[in-house]
Amino acid sequence: MAAQAPTEALKELQVGEAATTNGKEAPDGNAGRQRQRRLGGRGRCGPRCSPAVRVPLRRRRRRRRTRKKKKAPTAQSDPPRVLMSQLFPQKNYPVGEECEYLNENAYRTTDEEKRHLDNLNSDFLTDYREAAEIHRQVRQWAQKNIKPGQGLTEIAEGIEDGVRALTGHWGLEEGDALKGGMGFPTGLSINHCAAHYTPNLGNKMVLQQEDVMKVDFGVHVNGRIVDSAFTLAFEPKYDNLLTAVREATNAGVKEAGIDVRVGDIGGVIQEVMESYEVEIDGTTYPVKSIRNLNGHTIERWSIHGAKSVPIVKSNDTTKMEEGDVFAVETFGSTGNGYVRDDMEVSHYAKRGDSNVPLRLDSAKRLLNVINKNFGTLPFCRRYLDRLGQEKYLLGLNNLVSAGIVEAYPPLVDKKGSYTAQFEHTILIRPTVKEVISRGEDY
């Protein structure tokens, strides 16, 4: 129901309509309408109000629209694309599996001193734990999604895109891949091929139901590399082979520690590995340690350090030391237990100590690309293709011949055999050893 104006106020307003402006009478019938238009038309009380009744218009206060802040993601996407910095804004990355040393030498330092030494390595630990969490999240996705019928290129690129997305470094701008990303190319070695195989451009290989595939990839943050590997098989007949190698790796990890001789670790690994046998299609095979493959130390920016960890018993008296980072990896085989170079090369790495003059212009240009994008981190031909490099094979072979770049051919046992691999990165800290790459899967 519309409100009415008081009678006295109405009379005053009607008299006002006949008032003069500057002593002159306003034109009859027009002044009210013109004044009404100037004052904004009809009053707020609606069309039934008298034209002479004007109620001042109030400006509506505009409510400020506050944009709702997007909630930070709390879980990884599928495929993995959520940055680690979003999932862990305070950089409180999960700690790896911490294990007490079996043969702790109490005379070395007091517990307080060792804890102090651990605290000095905060950047070191943060980088390693971030890289390890990226590895866990990407491999978790890979284990769920890799299926027979997929091409090896699709599998490799899926893993590598996940790593790059989670580090936030896609490696397409000069120097970006040196800040974080792939620690080395994704190895997808099948059946009798034990290591160092990744598809080159145009590769048409497809994963088969009967295949046993080693998935070996590295993640680095600021040059600190986590190296970890697992084996996938889709037929239960290979279960004992995978169990033998996984348990051998765990035994090596358990034995590792400050002042432990690497030759002794090799003996423990071999004993566990070769206690297994596997029956495949009616034939029983002993599982053998591949005697010419080893674990190794990891240096900053370099996947292979100076020390090795054999996977068979040896007389090597080299000791693990505080501050070392080791990749403890084991390989088991139903074949000869010995590998040789074979097949097309895909893995390469620049040597850190090479300084040889080059004559070939293509080699000089390629070396410049390698220095600016990979440094001494391993790379593969697909990575050069991805950077837009073309017709580089002549220059690459020249760098290999000159000893500036090292080629890593695929390593194979005898045809018809099956090989498996499991690997962990461990930090030899002053107080404990930390199995940095440990996850719920292995």
Curated annotation (Swiss-Prot):
It is found in: Cytoplasm. Cotranslationally removes the N-terminal methionine from nascent proteins. The N-terminal methionine is often cleaved when the second residue in the primary sequence is small and uncharged (Met-Ala-, Cys, Gly, Pro, Ser, Thr, or Val). The keyword Metal-binding applies. It catalyses: Release of N-terminal amino acids, preferentially methionine, from peptides and arylamides. Residues 1-81 are annotated as: Disordered. NCBIfam families: met_pdase_II. Residues 56-72 have a biased composition (Basic residues). The lineage of its organism: Eukaryota, Fungi, Dikarya, Ascomycota, Pezizomycotina. Pfam families: Peptidase_M24. HAMAP family: MetAP_2_euk. A divalent metal cation 1 binds at D216, D227, E423. It comes from Verticillium alfalfae (strain VaMs.102 / ATCC MYA-4576 / FGSC 10136) (Verticillium wilt of alfalfa). Disulfide bonds: none annotated. Binds 2 divalent metal cations per subunit. Has a high-affinity and a low affinity metal-binding site. The true nature of the physiological cofactor is under debate. The enzyme is active with cobalt, zinc, manganese or divalent iron ions. Most likely, methionine aminopeptidases function as mononuclear Fe(2+)-metalloproteases under physiological conditions, and the catalytically relevant metal-binding site has been assigned to the histidine-containing high-affinity site. SUPFAM superfamilies: Creatinase/aminopeptidase (SSF55920), Winged helix' DNA-binding domain (SSF46785). Its cofactor is Co(2+); Zn(2+); Mn(2+); Fe(2+). This is Methionine aminopeptidase 2. Keywords: Aminopeptidase, Cytoplasm, Hydrolase, Metal-binding, Protease. InterPro entries: Creatinase/aminopeptidase-like, Met_Aminopeptidase_Type2, Pept_M24, Pept_M24_MAP, Pept_M24A_MAP2, Pept_M24A_MAP2_BS, WH-like_DNA-bd_sf, WH_DNA-bd_sf.
